[in-house]
Each structure stands twice: as C-alpha cells, then as structure tokens.
Amino acid sequence: MLHASFSNAQLTPTFYDNSCPNVSNIVRDIIINELRSDPSIAASILRLHFHDCFVNGCDASILLDNTTSFRTEKDAFGNANSARGFPVVDRIKAAVERACPRTVSCADVLTIAAQQSVNLAGGPSWRVPLGRRDSRQAFLDLANANLPAPSFTLPELKAAFANVGLNRPSDLVALSGGHTFGKNQCRFIMDRLYNFSNTGLPDPTLNTTYLQTLRQQCPRNGNQSVLVDFDLRTPTVFDNKYYVNLKEQKGLIQSDQELFSSPNATDTIPLVRSYADGTQTFFNAFVEAMNRMGNITPLTGTQGEIRLNCRVVNSNSLLHDIVEVVDFVSSM
C-alpha cells in the first residue's frame, strides 16, 4: 500500500524560472495547436497526469514503454485502450528539449500540460509547483491496484484516494470534476445501462431520460468502443456543469453519480451542491486538490533522473543513440 508524503517545500512554481523560463509557453503553444484537430485532447492530458500521480506519485512512470525489466503501466486495466495523448507529450518534450536540453523532467512536462489543458478548455489558471524528477521504472501491478475504476462505490473511491494521501472529501469531489470534459467508452457503462449489479435492470440512480439517450448511443449489442461525452451540456468545456449533472442524476459512470446518490455521500453531497452553485468555488477547490495530487511522493533533488525521451529511461535512450551512431559510422 502506498502512503503519500506531501513535499510542498521541495517543489516550487519558480523552479525553472532561470533554467527554462519559457517552458509553460512552449507547452501551451503545442496544446493550442493540438486542440485545433482534437478538442478532446485536453481532457486526455489531464487524465494522464491523474493516472501518473496515483501510481507511485507524479513521476512520469505512465509514459514509459515496455522493457525487458518491467511492464508498462499503459497495459493496466485503467489505461489499456483508453489512456491517450502520449504522442502529444512526446512533441511537447521534444520542443522543451530543444529550448532547454536536459533540464525539464517528463513528470513536470505532464504536470504543466495538464494545467494548461484545463485552462485552455475554460478552466482556472494557476502556477503549478515544479521540480519533480522522473522514475526509472514503471509499476504495472501498482497501477492495477491504485487506479479508481468506473464501477467503484463511494467507499471504494474514498479508499483509493486515501491510499495515496488524498483523504479530504474535497480532494475526491473536486478532482472528479475533471470529468466535466472528455469522453468515455460504452464498455464502462454497459452494466449501468442494462444489468446493474446483475439485476437485469439499469442503475436506479440514472435519470430515465438520460438512460434512454445513453442506450441509443450504446445499444446492448453495439460497438463498446464508441465514445460518449462525460458532460452532455458542455462536453469540451472545463466548467462546473459536471456537478449540475450529478444533481439531476446524469453522471455518466457509476463512480461519478456515487458522489451524490450513494447512501454514504453525506460528506460529498454538500460539496457537489456547492460546486454546482458556484464555478469559482469549484475552480478554487480544484486547484487546491490538483496541487495536493501533484505533491504525492515526488522524486526530487538527485532522485530519479531527467528523461531525455519520456518513453524510455536514459540508459536505454543513450544506448539507442549510441547504436545509431555506430551504425552510421560503420556504413561510411
């Protein structure tokens, strides 16, 4: 079990002010360009950061590909065939490396990218604490154990968040608001629509009109990879409509609606109501929760490394470069 330690003192928003002062602008410009062709990429980048931080802290371990010594977290149940945005992170990292070689970690690149994605989609602007370093391995088993599932009940959600040190109700409710934009696959809601808890009936907490809409998008024998908007009101905008939806029983996945409809929701219902009533209240809570999540067991100082290629640890990256040079020289 991972118990988080928060290290605010080691991370600071000014970390790259001298060594790479334009890093945030570099990241932002690339995301602006990506959004032109893929409006849902902002939500995908935020999700990558979330899934990174929940597994051994925010160390960019989710970005590593398979090696002979470890399996990638990309194969974990919560990531396989759903985590996306890796090529965008590659492009951001390459641009940052051109401007500031061997300076900005992949973990910080992903953290900045998540913040910029939220802001560009209409969400708050804030300076994220920086100074993380990158892990030298991935943690598939930990990803399978730690990542919350769409079918989680509220007690299971609370346990998953507390397990990584996010033990405030506001952590859970505010970070769940990341589902105010983005999409989800039909396969994650089929039980809610047709056979909730093996009853042969839909989830009773699902608004009946919304149920019919979702059944049209996700028919019983249809393609379960079809994508459905998390937020039926403003699907690509980062706002507080997610919470308005929960009040109307229109949360897309079970773990969303649990925040308002679970018998155990006495401490989360008031927060859902508060965020639904005030965008700024939600934004303030979201920024605080994002910074707390961003401070889960960071590698700092001389721990870990600054990866040159976010997909591979440096020894492999350098070996790859050396092999290319040797091949080139031998062909001369």
From Swiss-Prot:
Keyword Ribonucleoprotein listed: no
Supply the EC number(s): 1.11.1.7
Q: Where does substrate bind?
A: P148
The UniProt annotation places heme b binding at H179
Cofactor(s) the protein needs: Ca(2+); heme b
Signal peptide range equals 1-9
Print the keywords alphabetically: Calcium, Disulfide bond, Glycoprotein, Heme, Hydrogen peroxide, Iron, Metal-binding, Oxidoreductase, Peroxidase, Pyrrolidone carboxylic acid, Secreted, Signal, Vacuole
Q: Which cysteines are joined by disulfide bonds?
A: C20-C100, C53-C58, C106-C310, C186-C218
MF term (GO), any: metal ion binding
The free-text cofactor remark is: Binds 2 calcium ions per subunit.
Q: What is this protein's name?
A: Peroxidase C1C
Q: Which gene encodes it?
A: PRXC1C
